[in-house]
Regions:
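Active-/binding-site microenvironments in catalytic and ligand-binding cores
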Residues: 4, 10-276
Length: 276
């Protein structure tokens, strides 16, 4: 409180709530029984509730019995059988190839510069493009022109595709457009080091690529977006979600990966941060 100079009354300063940014969760959960990956790569989480573990907790202390625990309850715990590529995750260049930047050893997820993972974000809206379509550099430029934005180095560019709304559906891994070599290098040549998609893969769905390969026998089509990392190292976030909630620009994207030693990827709780 402070003194009023003229009246001598003690007045209260008006309280102002501090400005708090808006946080938007753009990640999918790790969960059982959702077709977010091919069958060979599905998540399995085993859950144990408090009553099941009372004996384990009590057994850690000689002379203790489960009935002496509060309400006879232990702890809740989960055991997960997962790949580093389950859930929303950040791929390191090591995932794509043993080398990057034209021959240097590709870096693993624990070696990624953390400052790459907390940067202004740019959302490209490609929901109108058909499933399996391979985005071109011209389409990227046209979308940037539509939103009135010029890319700056180290911005995080994410693609909102038709796959986003298909999460949870049986055909999720076949949905959405993808990015090949040309589009990927078009972005990284402008200083972009982290990209992302709400699809299963940064590349076009495997089912669409398989059809193109069957028609052309062109091996360069296979995983061409990922393999662009041989030429210039970059990271990509896969299986983002809720990108429809984001503006085209004006947000910060946070995607710090879990530090898995010498790994090709790390899980991330990706978040978009908007000013109040």
């Amino acid at each position: 409180m402070y003194e009023c100079a003229k009246s001598g009354r003690r007045n209260r300063r008006p309280w102002r709530t501090p400005s708090v940014p808006k946080f938007i969760d753009i990640s999918i959960p790790l969960e059982n029984d959702v077709a977010a990956d091919p069958p060979f790569q599905r998540v399995r989480i085993d859950y144990q509730a408090h009553a099941e573990t009372a004996g384990v907790l009590a057994g850690a202390f000689p002379g203790m019995t489960p009935d002496r625990l509060p309400d006879g309850m232990g702890w809740a715990v989960e055991t997960a059988h997962i790949s580093t590529h389950n859930g929303t995750h950040l791929d390191a260049p090591w995932h794509y190839h043993p080398t990057m930047d034209g021959g240097a050893r590709a870096v693993t997820i624990d070696e990624i510069p953390l400052d790459w993972c907390f940067r202004p974000g740019v959302k490209l809206d490609f929901r109108h493009l058909p499933d399996g379509h391979v985005v071109t550099p011209a389409e990227i430029d046209a979308e940037l022109a539509r939103i009135g934005h010029r890319l700056s180095p180290f911005e995080i560019v994410v693609a909102n595709t038709a796959a986003g709304k298909a999460y949870g559906d049986a055909d999720y891994i076949d949905r959405g457009c993808g990015f090949g070599r040309d589009a990927t290098l078009h972005l990284v040549s402008q200083g972009i080091r982290v990209v992302g998609t709400d699809g299963w893969s940064w590349d076009a769905p495997f089912s669409a690529t398989a059809r193109r390969f069957a028609e052309t026998n062109d091996a360069s089509l296979i995983w061409e977006g990922h393999k662009a990392g041989r030429e210039k190292g970059y990271c990509q976030i896969e299986k983002l979600h809720n990108l429809e909630a984001l503006p085209a620009t004006g947000f910060t994207l946070c995607c710090f990966p879990v530090k898995v030693r010498a790994a090709s990827a790390g899980w991330t709780r990706a978040v978009a941060i908007l000013p109040d």
